[in-house]
């Protein structure tokens, strides 16, 4: 069903449609012709089962993506022992990854124009697999740095391209859930893959963990090439007629919008927390809380379970409420921003907690509430730009997000080295992350409004598809 977001009468009305009155007067136009779409098919005749199957394939690549990131945290202590590394050096490696990850994110739009999604994602996945192998052959600090720099550069464009591919199969009003599943790939990776990598590391050595990740990437490429096809909702590579129908918006106007700026600050601050969890959670669990190495490698699961549940629940609720006429600002800005505020309060209290299991619970719940920003803010930012500019807009948005990962792991290593005990250092680092995220969430609550910015940046935008009466 199609819903027009134009205000007033006649804007977007057409035969077979009816006006729906919102709190500020006529706000929506419901297309009853679209409502008659056969069961199992979407507004543009696409198979919904096929759409979700291909979305699952994209999520599986994101699981590999996050496993490649998380493996450094899992093998950090064995690497430290074998290569004689300090906490600051491990943190530096984690941050350098996000340096090239940030740079790579700016190439998402270019890749989307130069290559089809089919081949651009294969290229990236092959690069990830190749990045795992140098450390297997020659283990040294220099090789570790270079391999992580290359991995970061190759992973940088992936998030925007994966979201673009997923959004191509889902109408705008129903994108929070597929976005949540993509964001939830981090949790799936830490719940299902990280414990397996921990077992491999403890049983066979850290090199075999890297080999397993490389093999997983190669297997995914074979499946992808035999199944993927582009969806009907977003142009990729060669633009479609429907995408061409809406004029492009100046890039500077998109990037200067208050929704984009404050949204980028929030996701950057939360991604700083994510990157510290990826790099340091096993070390915090082992050195700071006294758990065994195998237990510490499995600790990824706890914050990830909470994060995955909250992301999926909030995204399902968001899609359903927006389909029924609720505002995008309330569901995609206010709700996740309040979640970040809750996270900030919990992380601020972490240094005062002396019981290991309570510390794990606080960190897990705080992480879970903060993680809800990713699918919802991504959907909000995609809303303010024309379809042909989605990959480029999300590429820059997510590249800015990755700056949090550039700074936070190294800063955490410095704090831990300077602290009286590892436990005190890790807790202080998480406290600082909570304060910064809470401040950024307040800015988004005050300034971000995707509906306002969509109306200003996209005056000729077509009706929002995918809503139901």
Where are the regions a protein language model picked out?
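Helix-loop-helix hairpin linking two adjacent transmembrane segments in secondary transporters
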Residues: 182-231
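Juxtamembrane intracellular "pre-TM" segments in multi-pass secondary transporters
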Residues: 38-47, 231-264, 288, 464-466
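Helix-breaking motifs and short loop linkers at transmembrane-helix boundaries and internal kinks
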Residues: 84, 116, 137-143, 171, ...
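Conserved MFS/SLC helix-loop-helix module at the cytosolic interface between two early adjacent transmembrane helices
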Residues: 103-139
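Extracytoplasmic gate region of multi-pass secondary transporters
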Residues: 72-73, 258-315, 374, 378, ...
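C-terminal ends and interior cores of transmembrane alpha-helices
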Residues: 126-139, 337-354
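A membrane-interface helix-boundary motif in multi-pass transporters
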Residues: 202-214, 292, 331, 414-435
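Cytoplasmic helix-loop-helix junction between adjacent transmembrane helices
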Residues: 147-187
């Amino acid at each position: 069903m199609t819903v027009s977001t134009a205000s007033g009468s006649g804007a977007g009305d057409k035969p077979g449609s009816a006006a729906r009155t919102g709190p500020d007067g006529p706000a929506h136009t419901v297309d009853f012709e679209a409502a008659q779409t056969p069961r199992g098919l979407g507004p543009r005749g696409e198979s919904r089962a096929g759409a979700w199957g291909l979305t699952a394939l994209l999520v599986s690549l994101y699981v590999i993506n996050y496993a490649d990131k998380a493996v450094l945290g899992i093998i950090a202590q064995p690497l430290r022992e074998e290569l004689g590394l300090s906490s600051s050096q491990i943190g530096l490696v984690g941050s350098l990854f996000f340096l090239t990850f940030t740079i790579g994110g700016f190439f998402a739009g270019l890749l989307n124009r130069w290559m089809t999604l089919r081949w651009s994602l294969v290229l990236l996945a092959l690069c990830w697999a190749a990045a795992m192998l140098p450390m297997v052959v020659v283990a040294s600090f220099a090789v570790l740095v270079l391999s992580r720099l290359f991995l970061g550069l190759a992973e940088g464009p992936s998030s925007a391209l994966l979201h673009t591919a997923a959004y191509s199969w889902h109408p705008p009003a129903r994108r929070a859930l597929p976005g949540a599943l993509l964001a939830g790939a981090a949790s799936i990776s830490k719940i299902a893959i990280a414990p397996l990598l921990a077992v491999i590391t403890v049983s066979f050595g850290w090199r075999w963990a890297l080999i397993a990740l490389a093999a997983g990437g190669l297997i995914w490429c074979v499946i992808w090439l035999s199944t993927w096809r582009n969806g009907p909702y977003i142009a990729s590579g060669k633009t479609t007629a429907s995408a061409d129908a809406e004029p492009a918006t100046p890039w500077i106007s998109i990037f200067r919008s208050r929704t984009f700026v404050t949204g980028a600050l929030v996701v950057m601050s939360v991604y700083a927390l994510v990157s510290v969890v990826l790099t340091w959670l096993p070390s915090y669990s082992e050195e700071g809380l006294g758990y065994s190495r195998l237990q510490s490698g499995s600790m990824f699961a706890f914050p990830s379970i909470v994060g995955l549940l909250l992301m999926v629940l909030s995204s399902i609720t968001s899609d359903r409420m927006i389909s029924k006429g609720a505002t995008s600002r309330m569901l995609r800005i206010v709700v996740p921003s309040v979640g970040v505020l809750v996270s900030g309060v919990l992380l601020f209290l972490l240094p005062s907690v002396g019981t290991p299991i309570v510390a794990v619970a606080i960190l897990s719940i705080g992480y879970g509430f903060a993680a809800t920003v990713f699918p919802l803010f991504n959907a909000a930012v995609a809303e303010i730009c024309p379809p042909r500019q989605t990959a480029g807009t999300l590429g820059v948005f997510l590249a800015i997000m990755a700056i949090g990962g550039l700074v936070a792991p190294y800063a955490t290593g410095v704090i831990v080295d300077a602290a009286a005990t590892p436990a005190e250092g890790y807790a202080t680092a998480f406290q600082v992350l909570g304060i910064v995220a809470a401040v950024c969430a307040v800015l988004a609550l005050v300034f971000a409004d995707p509906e306002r910015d969509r109306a200003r940046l996209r005056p000729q935008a077509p009706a929002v598809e995918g809503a139901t009466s």
